[in-house]
Design a protein with these regions (language model features):
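Conserved Nudix-box catalytic region and its N-terminal flanking loop in Nudix hydrolases
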Residues: 19-59, 70-71
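Active-site mouth loops of central-metabolism enzymes
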Residues: 130-144, 223-228
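Active-site-adjacent beta-strand/loop module that shapes the phosphate/pyrophosphate-binding cleft
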Residues: 73-96
Length: 312
């Protein structure tokens, strides 16, 4: 087993139609014949972003205009250890082509599961399929929940967790049915909190509370996230092959005034120890998105984060 780590910069590149660019590794290369996200190893003295710009120019002939951090993945193949520094690239000049003779394809995100990728790429696929915003839907009344749901949609939230801890039990079933109908109409992904006991309401998956995560023996079906507060919980979410985790609290929050906030650097240190997309939660506003991404988060999660009066 080698102790050297190969540091690679790679990109999830999207075109104007939302399609993702993938390329095929040469047959003679490590993990040959498999598909991957374009990129390559860092040269001496390069930053990951500098390497990304150079590699995409050399490999697929495009000039990167903007790039945002997506996820870092550490993987040990036995004969090779890699650190994949992955970025989202949505703005670029030029038309992609296989400069090194490699096959490439533009595919819809949902087609990623149809292609064979190296094992280290699997967390990247999870991150590529997730948005930057994760709304947690709560409210004290039916009207408040539905109003907040509409505000989430106006803020561009396309992934919602229905929690409803503050709503009277007798109202939860009816509200859940209404929210599900709204989400289906707007093509928004809806996860049900694991503590909700509802009949005949099937969302797109489940969000495990930290308590439910601790007792989980097998990954539930559908899209699955989990609430985490410690490295141990993050590692458990990773072990269960969940799609993502939510780490909290990052900043001081009025809803949990006694909870000690992690802060950005400790959050980053925790996230870098797991190969899993992780949303930042707690005391955050929309203006914190760039800070969250720069510190390794998938994006922002929140209740009040996406409400108009608190989003700036």
């Amino acid at each position: 087993m080698t102790t050297d780590v190969l540091h690679v910069a790679a990109a999830v590149i999207r075109d104007g139609n939302g399609r993702i660019l993938i390329t095929q590794r040469a047959k003679h290369a490590h993990q040959g014949g498999l598909w991957e996200f374009p990129g390559g190893k860092l040269e001496a003295g390069e930053t990951p972003q500098q390497a990304l710009v150079r590699e995409l120019r050399e490999e697929v002939g495009i000039e990167v205009k903007t790039a945002q951090p997506l996820i870092k993945v550490r993987h040990d193949y036995g004969d090779r250890r890699v650190l994949l520094d992955v970025w989202s690239v949505n703005e670029f000049d030029g038309e992609a082509w296989g400069c090194e003779g490699q096959a490439l394809q533009w595919i819809a995100p949902q087609q990623l599961s149809d292609f064979a990728f190296p094992a280290a790429n699997l967390p990247i696929i999870k991150a590529a399929l997730l948005p930057s915003y994760y709304g947690i839907l709560e409210g004290n009344s039916v009207e408040q929940v539905l109003t907040r749901c509409q505000q989430f949609l106006q803020a561009g939230v396309s992934l919602i967790q229905l929690r409803l801890k503050s709503l009277p039990i007798e109202n939860r079933q009816a509200v859940a049915e209404q929210v599900l109908a709204i989400c289906q109409h707007r093509s928004v992904t809806l996860l049900l909190n694991s503590d909700l006991q509802l009949a005949d309401v099937q969302g797109d998956g489940v969000h495990l509370s930290s308590r439910a995560l601790q007792s989980c023996q097998q990954r539930p079906e559908g899209l699955v996230g989990a609430s985490c507060h410690t490295l141990e919980e993050l590692r458990l979410a990773e072990k269960l092959a969940l799609d993502f985790a939510v780490l909290a609290p990052i900043q001081p929050t009025s809803t949990h005034p006694d909870a000690k906030p992690l802060g950005w650097q400790p959050m980053r240190a925790l996230i870098e120890q797991v190969n899993l997309p992780v949303y930042a939660l707690g005391g955050l506003r929309l203006a914190d998105l760039d800070q969250a991404l720069a510190n390794g988060a998938q994006g922002l999660a929140g209740i009040s984060t996406f409400l108009m009066e608190n989003s700036q």
